[in-house]
Regions:
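Non-heme di-metal
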Residues: 2-212
Length: 212
């Protein structure tokens, strides 16, 4: 498998080794509020991850200036999604995690600078998958309000995984990046393989990808 190389200024979902399956789209459309609430949790966690990396690499030149605005934007998205949830008579209830991010985290190496490289690439892959699935919902959701919401968020999500690519490209050789991205992209697909046992537990990052 060969992962297409993102451009420095215009990354794309070519980060991903396999596309989302139509089964996931159908499951997500059947349980729109569960996916929406999970999406709010995803935005909250993405903000937390950006802040965590900003403080972990506090003295790394340029990281604070890049990650602080990203974290703020993730929180703005969280508030936007939360507002829609509340307008529909629901609240930010706890939801069981599909384990997607935890599976990816196991592939992050412990020593530096490998830990930094893996952390940024994993964060970028998660953003890329979010972008891809939001694009599917923006096109195929039967709910016009949800189509509008997901469509509005697409440009920001693309910027986010593009930013993570730029951050690693500034710090590592291209050959090292591509080799590691290929490995982690396959791990990302493996984290989404399988069949959802219960349609009620569909999440933004629940299983549902096409074969590699």
């Amino acid at each position: 498998m060969t992962v297409s190389l993102p451009q420095k200024t215009t990354a794309s979902i070519r980060w991903l080794a396999a596309p989302t399956s139509w089964t996931w789209v159908e499951q997500a459309n059947a349980r729109p509020m569960e996916v929406l609430i999970d999406h709010a949790h995803c935005e909250r966690k993405a903000a937390g991850s950006a802040v965590q990396m900003m403080f972990r690499y506090l003295c790394e030149p340029g990281l604070g200036e890049a990650l602080s605005p990203l974290a703020r934007e993730e929180l703005e998205h969280f508030e936007q999604v939360l507002g829609l949830i509340k307008s529909r008579g629901r609240y930010l209830e706890p939801l069981p995690s599909p384990g997607y991010a935890a599976k990816l985290a196991r592939h992050i190496r412990k020593g530096e600078p490998q830990r930094m490289l893996d952390s940024f690439l994993v964060a970028g892959l998660i953003e890329a998958r979010s972008h891809e699935r939001m694009a599917l919902l923006a096109e195929h959701s039967p709910d016009s309000e949800l189509r509008s919401l997901y469509g509005d968020l697409l440009a920001s999500e693309a910027r986010h995984f593009g930013l993570y690519w730029v951050l690693v490209e500034e710090r590592f050789s291209r050959a090292v990046l591509i080799e590691r991205l290929q490995t982690l992209a396959l791990a990302e697909v493996a984290a989404l393989q399988g069949v959802l046992d219960c349609p009620e537990i569909v999440r933004m990052h629940s299983c549902g990808v096409c074969p590699v």
